[in-house]
């Protein structure tokens, strides 16, 4: 599959979707994107910058949601203009899609909306690549139905069906907890869509701090290594210059000054894993 200006798939090096959870300010966004660009260019990792203009799904109604659509999209357009990077953001309702798609290179659907058929259809008809997140409540094999919905809508609109990615971000395991079943990454390959692993939301503790979500960022490297060892087309990781001061999802954000070391390890592992065919393909 061609994404932005690079090929993605199990026969390609993993690509990275990374950035702050939410757009907090223009300067921090440009600085963070610039640093990530430097790291990824050094390691030859294809890179898409992500950040949200609005966090519609918050634990508390008093939580920071963002700078608003117009300002958030303006700042993301500056990332494209100043740094020459492709950008991704999430959309939360059908009426947002057209405006967002006019700015960003890739759309993302929130995990909680993966079963909303009209919403998935509308995203697919935008003409943009779409990173479709698997709901925390969904079995991995059920993602085939979700991807098929997107492809059907694209085909009916006369658009390419080869624009959709399936993203794993953990599954609910009791109250305020998520776990990652690495088998799901192999199962989701049956969608014939590139599989992406969200290593930071997978360590989230939803609502774990009462009015906000907690997280265990120390396990991001553990799960990221496991996902790369399993074999994925891409990785999704949120980062922040100072996670303790992040306005959203700080507890599960990778410190920006540790991203280089983490990615260096993951690149080495990815190269080793993809050197040979995946044995599981021949076991049945």
Swiss-Prot record:
Compartment list: Cytoplasm
Pathway(s) of this molecule: Carbohydrate biosynthesis; 3-deoxy-D-manno-octulosonate biosynthesis; 3-deoxy-D-manno-octulosonate from D-ribulose 5-phosphate: step 2/3; Bacterial outer membrane biogenesis; lipopolysaccharide biosynthesis
Record-linked Gene3D superfamilies: Aldolase class I (3.20.20.70)
Reactions it catalyzes: D-arabinose 5-phosphate + phosphoenolpyruvate + H2O = 3-deoxy-alpha-D-manno-2-octulosonate-8-phosphate + phosphate
Top-level class of the enzyme under EC nomenclature: transferase
Chief subcellular location: cytoplasm
GO-annotated biological processes: keto-3-deoxy-D-manno-octulosonic acid biosynthetic process
EC number: 2.5.1.55
Lineage top rank: taxon: Bacteria
Tagged with keyword Cytoplasm: yes
Annotated GO MF terms: 3-deoxy-8-phosphooctulonate synthase activity
Pfam family, one: DAHP_synth_1
Keyword list, A-Z: Cytoplasm, Lipopolysaccharide biosynthesis, Transferase
A GO cellular component entry from the record: cytoplasm
Similarity comment: Belongs to the KdsA family.
Matching NCBIfam families: KDO8P_synth, PRK05198.1
Name this protein carries in UniProt: 2-dehydro-3-deoxyphosphooctonate aldolase
Provenance organism: Burkholderia cenocepacia (strain ATCC BAA-245 / DSM 16553 / LMG 16656 / NCTC 13227 / J2315 / CF5610)
Lineage of producing organism: Bacteria, Pseudomonadati, Pseudomonadota, Betaproteobacteria, Burkholderiales
């Amino acid at each position: 599959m061609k994404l932005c200006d690079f090929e993605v798939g199990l026969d390609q090096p993993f690509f990275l979707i990374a950035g702050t959870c939410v757009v907090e300010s223009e300067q921090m966004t440009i600085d963070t994107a610039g640093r990530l660009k430097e790291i990824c260019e050094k390691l030859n990792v294809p890179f898409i910058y992500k950040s949200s203009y609005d966090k519609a799904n918050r634990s508390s109604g008093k939580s920071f949601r963002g700078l608003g659509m117009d300002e958030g999209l303006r700042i993301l357009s500056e990332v494209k203009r100043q740094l020459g990077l492709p950008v991704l953001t999430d959309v939360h309702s059908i009426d947002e899609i057209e405006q967002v798609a006019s700015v960003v290179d890739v759309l993302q659907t929130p995990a909680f909306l993966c079963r909303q058929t009209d919403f998935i259809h509308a995203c697919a008809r935008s003409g943009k690549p779409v990173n479709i997140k698997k709901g925390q409540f969904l079995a991995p094999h059920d993602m085939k139905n979700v991807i098929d919905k997107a492809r059907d809508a694209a085909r009916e609109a006369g658009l390419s069906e080869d624009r959709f990615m399936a993203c794993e971000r953990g599954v609910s395991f009791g109250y305020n907890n998520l776990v990652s079943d690495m088998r799901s990454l192999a199962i989701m390959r049956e969608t014939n869509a590139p599989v992406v692993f969200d290593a930071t939301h997978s360590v989230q503790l939803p609502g774990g701090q009462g009015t906000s979500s907690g997280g265990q960022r120390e396990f991001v490297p553990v799960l990221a290594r496991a996902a790369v060892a399993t074999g994925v087309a891409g990785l999704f990781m949120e980062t922040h210059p100072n996670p303790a001061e992040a306005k959203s999802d700080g507890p599960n954000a990778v410190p920006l000054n540790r991203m280089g070391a983490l990615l260096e390890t993951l690149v080495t592992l990815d190269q080793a894993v993809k050197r040979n065919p995946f044995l599981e393909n021949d076991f049945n």
